[in-house]
Amino acid sequence: MTRSLKKNPFVAKHLLRKIEKLNTKAEKEIIRTWSRASTIIPTMIGHTIAIHNGREHLPVYIIDLMVGHKLGEFSPTINFRGHAKNDNRSRR
């Protein structure tokens, strides 16, 4: 179920403060965050945000096509290594 249009998109307050601070300075820094549930808003465009995937922070450059999506969508948490091979020699 999608979020109601009457409500504003969720963005963590600490993340929003950091982005507004960088926008006033006009500097580009990598912002580290654990807030995967935050929605990408237009003020984030052009910034690089390092999103935590449970083990490390993955840097993601925010572009205009990402607006409206959640930060966690761009930081995969599971690394699928494939199914086990069917090795007939090990069965003998």
UniProtKB/Swiss-Prot annotation:
**Compartments where found:** Plastid, Chloroplast
Q: Which UniProt keywords apply?
A: Chloroplast, Plastid, Ribonucleoprotein, Ribosomal protein, RNA-binding, rRNA-binding
Q: Name one GO molecular function term.
A: structural constituent of ribosome
Primary localization class, coarse:
plastid
Query: Which PROSITE patterns does the UniProt entry name for this protein?
Result: RIBOSOMAL_S19 (PS00323)
GO cellular component entries: chloroplast; mitochondrial small ribosomal subunit
Its biological function? Protein S19 forms a complex with S13 that binds strongly to the 16S ribosomal RNA.
Pfam families xref list: Ribosomal_S19
> Which family does the record claim for this protein?
Belongs to the universal ribosomal protein uS19 family.
What Gene3D superfamilies does the record point to? 30s Ribosomal Protein S19, Chain A (3.30.860.10)
Any idea what this protein is called? Small ribosomal subunit protein uS19c
* InterPro entries reported in the protein's UniProt record: Ribosomal_uS19, Ribosomal_uS19_bac-type, Ribosomal_uS19_CS, Ribosomal_uS19_SF
Q: Which HAMAP family match?
A: Ribosomal_uS19
Q: Which GO terms describe its biological process?
A: ribosomal small subunit assembly; translation
